[in-house]
Amino acid sequence: MGGSTKQALLQALSAAEGAYISGQQLAEALGVSRAAVHKAAQTLSAQGYALDSAPRRGYRLAGGDPFCAEAVGPYPAPIHIYDTLQSSNLTAKQLALGGAPHGTLVLTAHQLAGRGRLGRRFESPAGKGVYLSLILRPTLSAADAQSATISAAVAVARAVKALCGLELGIKWVNDLYYQGRKVCGILTEAGTDMESGQLEWLVVGIGLNLTTSPADWPEELARTAGSLYPGGPAPVSRAVLAGAIARELLTLCPAFDCLDEYRARCFVPGHWVTVCTGAETYAAKALSIDDAGRLVVEREGGRQAALQHGEVSIRPTRTG
């Protein structure tokens, strides 16, 4: 029994919105035998779908959070899905080095050593978040790493709005916030040809807290980290949301033409911030996002800088 039958059955039952459909109706609609429908239903149940069957009534999809490639939905590139990984970005980079094509998606239910920017650990409790990495192979330039991160933030915000009805704000450059708490981080890494110095691929890693509860955070994150639906349940499955995010990002690549939308969602300009560049830390007024995606700030004394990298945090009050 092919994956196409499973996918078609899943789509038919999802469209029925919890109503029963008889085995005969499904067989006729899908152009397969009733035995094939039954086998597909068994496979979906084994993959985590809450599938009910009843004599003389048929089948219905009762809900659940299935985590499998079929649940991602139609997708134009290979999908690699895992129960547990050290890091989805690490696996994606290994696949990229092996020649995995543009759009390859790595999805995991749990990361043992998820990473954020500046080498920070990204907490990834099992079954409670969307943890994915996407391989991009457009015509690449050095500026594309920043553009890909910006586009990924927009892709997450679009997908969450479409499927959850929630509006996320963006904190330059790579964090998304909901109700004042960080719910998503993005890490973009690049592979370079050693001879030419040209970028060969980008791996965009996205970690979105979906149903993580306060008890899941270590103490140092408890006051700043959040999730879309703390403790659950969520109205959308992790795989469906991951697929929506990945498809949104692929539509933005390779043009990465979403800077105006990024600016509209970014809440940093207009605030006093603390800037940490690695070399120095200073207070500044965040002014705008320029056409290269850099954060333009004005230091005390009037000197302006356009930040390509670095970390900013909004200052709670402005004194002096």
Could you tell me what each predicted segment is?
Residues 2-161, 184:
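N-terminal lobe of the biotin/lipoate ligase/transferase fold
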Residues 83, 170-172:
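Short loop/edge segments at beta-strand edges and connector loops
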